[in-house]
Amino acid sequence: MRARRATLLLGLAGLLPAGPGLAAPPQRVVSLDLCSDWILTVHAAPGQIAALSPMGRRFGARYGPVGGWPEHDGSLEQVIALRPDRVIVGPYNASRLRQRLQALGVRVEVTALPTSLDQVAVFERQVLGLLGGDPSRARAPAPKPAADPAAPRLLVLGANGIATGRGTFEGEVIERAGWRNYLQAEGYQRLDIEALVADPPAAILWAAPVSPALANAFAGHRALRTVVPAPRWLHTDNWRWECPGPWTWDLVGQLRRWREEMR
């Protein structure tokens, strides 16, 4: 009788949440968006990822090792079939799927997307905590450089002649890397090609498009390519800008190296 009672209590204990500080790390984690994919490939333990989202394959972007990660197709049926004990998603993605999973009792954790460099470590610590990892593993922020009024000007140029100004995450990355932002206006601004050619930046950072498009015609203007020659057109994966995370410090480091090479 006592043995049977002990067995029953042990079985019930397995269904109850662990006490404070005793929660077991999740064993089957599923991501619903690209940024969550990336942070999981950085910090999840071997075998802890049940599946990543289909976004990396769809857009040809993946952080960390390219292959070997299981993926789901984004459907409710397939995610449920994975039996996840934790689903990770950003605040602006897969909202309908997230709600349906929550309605079915699946634990969904919505992470905070960093909007400043100071928030990158906060985001990283949050994810480490959700995975049962050590939050102290979050990367230390890159130190701020000394103010240099003679620092070269860098233009971050997007499609349709839209440039990134001050008061933006991208602008903060530029300054942390020791550049001056070419565009001193706040936010995102449409450039005038004549004004740009008359006063060109030291370099242009351009995310190369996957395929030719009219939206990229501004960047291909002959006059612009003349005043800013090919060696001063810098290229990075645009997804590294759209998904702030610990890899952002790699981007800062890359921009710093380019700045040093231009001296």
Question: Which ranges hold each PLM region?
Answer:
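N-terminal signal peptide c-region/cleavage motif recognized by signal peptidases
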Residues: 18-19
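Structured C-terminal subdomain patch of bacterial secreted/periplasmic proteins
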Residues: 27-28, 95, 118-138, 209-263
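Alpha-helical, coiled-coil/dimerization segments enriched in small aliphatic residues
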Residues: 53-58, 65-68, 164-189
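Basic- and aromatic-lined ligand-binding clefts that recognize polyanionic substrates
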Residues: 27-44, 130-178, 241
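A short, structured surface patch at a secondary-structure boundary
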Residues: 27-92
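Short helices/loops that flank or line small-molecule/ion binding pockets
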Residues: 75-84, 104, 192-203
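Short helix-initiation/N-cap motifs at beta->coil->alpha
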Residues: 67-77, 94, 114, 186-194
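N-terminal export leaders
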Residues: 4-8
